[in-house]
Amino acid sequence: MGQKVNPVGLRIGVIRDWESKWYAGKDYADFLHEDLKIREFINQRLSDASVSKVEIERAANRVNITIHTAKPGMVIGKGGSEVEALRKALNSLTGKRVHINILEIKRADLDAQLVADNIARQLENRISFRRAQKQQIQRTMRAGAQGIKTMVSGRLGGADIARSEYYSEGTVPLHTLRADIDYATSEADTTYGKLGVKVWIYRGEVLPTKKKTEEGGK
């Protein structure tokens, strides 16, 4: 059987960019572990703020962090109190000067990470995995997606044998590199164990297609 490559990693350098932007020689491993700690800390602290992704840039002894969220008000807090507390916590965590930017996600239903997290939260609240997937697919298609596929794996409905069930609508061209496909995973902790959630969202083509010139000067 053929295995599916991560659609985001496959498109880096074509239509996607890196989420960590820095150069390191012998400090590479330290920077990588620090990035993982920063992302884990932010995702835990802002678990209710619908955080999609965290971009990290480095310059000398300074770390620039960009948080993509659907609820910027929760991240900033009253008068900027929350984001200032977060900055101080990250300062002590990294030992470097941290600058935080916040970008709002206008359409949360077109963001694969937020969609996957939403399905996972519904599964934790004992909503049927079929209903959770079908409702989310309808919302995403209404938001303007050209295609979506969702998959939930694990002990579905408390079954003894784990299995996977997926639903899709529209088209999701995984082989087309110019196709803007957002992919994300999430986990749901249920009484029967963990359920894995995967989401692919096709948002249209990014690069313009070249017009074919007719031969013979016609």
Swiss-Prot record:
<dbReference type="GO" id="GO:0003735">
    <property type="term" value="F:structural constituent of ribosome"/>
</dbReference>
<comment type="subunit">
    <text>Part of the 30S ribosomal subunit. Forms a tight complex with proteins S10 and S14.</text>
</comment>
<dbReference type="GO" id="GO:0003729">
    <property type="term" value="F:mRNA binding"/>
</dbReference>
<dbReference type="InterPro" id="IPR004087">
    <property type="entry name" value="KH_dom"/>
</dbReference>
<dbReference type="InterPro" id="IPR015946">
    <property type="entry name" value="KH_dom-like_a/b"/>
</dbReference>
<dbReference type="InterPro" id="IPR005704">
    <property type="entry name" value="Ribosomal_uS3_bac-typ"/>
</dbReference>
<protein>
    <recommendedName>
        <fullName>Small ribosomal subunit protein uS3</fullName>
    </recommendedName>
</protein>
<dbReference type="Pfam" id="PF07650">
    <property type="entry name" value="KH_2"/>
</dbReference>
<dbReference type="InterPro" id="IPR001351">
    <property type="entry name" value="Ribosomal_uS3_C"/>
</dbReference>
<dbReference type="InterPro" id="IPR009019">
    <property type="entry name" value="KH_sf_prok-type"/>
</dbReference>
<keyword id="KW-0699">rRNA-binding</keyword>
<dbReference type="GO" id="GO:0022627">
    <property type="term" value="C:cytosolic small ribosomal subunit"/>
</dbReference>
<dbReference type="InterPro" id="IPR004044">
    <property type="entry name" value="KH_dom_type_2"/>
</dbReference>
<dbReference type="InterPro" id="IPR036419">
    <property type="entry name" value="Ribosomal_S3_C_sf"/>
</dbReference>
<feature type="domain" description="KH type-2">
    <location>
        <begin position="38"/>
        <end position="106"/>
    </location>
</feature>
<dbReference type="GO" id="GO:0019843">
    <property type="term" value="F:rRNA binding"/>
</dbReference>
<dbReference type="InterPro" id="IPR018280">
    <property type="entry name" value="Ribosomal_uS3_CS"/>
</dbReference>
<comment type="similarity">
    <text>Belongs to the universal ribosomal protein uS3 family.</text>
</comment>
<keyword id="KW-0687">Ribonucleoprotein</keyword>
<comment type="function">
    <text>Binds the lower part of the 30S subunit head. Binds mRNA in the 70S ribosome, positioning it for translation.</text>
</comment>
<dbReference type="Pfam" id="PF00189">
    <property type="entry name" value="Ribosomal_S3_C"/>
</dbReference>
<dbReference type="GO" id="GO:0006412">
    <property type="term" value="P:translation"/>
</dbReference>
<keyword id="KW-0694">RNA-binding</keyword>
<keyword id="KW-0689">Ribosomal protein</keyword>
